[in-house]
């Protein structure tokens, strides 16, 4: 609300609110494993705040800077090892966002044209893409063209078999 009154652009204000509301999330993550980090990034990717993986990665890069500045303002600022651990943690989260967490179906290694050869009902293309997106986000499927096409073929076979029953 303050950002709006000060006439900052809406997207900028939303990003500032996102950064402020999440900058303390990093601290407890220093004691967790990659699965917890992945779950956090997955939640943010699916939350509707970001349109692309690039936006998500940019936001986490900015969050890293806020987190490190916050750490530097505390006793951790005098502890180079602790600051290095914080930097490594933030880099790990950015890496997950950049390489393992698609935000939108457009971030997948396949598109509707690729699936047209597999799907018998073109109206279901969006459903298949969302299915593949969820599989990649969950870590059950790599975001690689061959793996996605194989998963789509398998899903189409199951759908066809179910319809024939």
Give residue ranges: language-model regions:
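Charged substrate- and nucleic-acid-binding regions of tRNA-handling and nucleotidyl-transfer enzymes
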Residues: 74-165
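Conserved, hydrophobic alpha-helical core segments of structured domains
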Residues: 1-81, 163-165
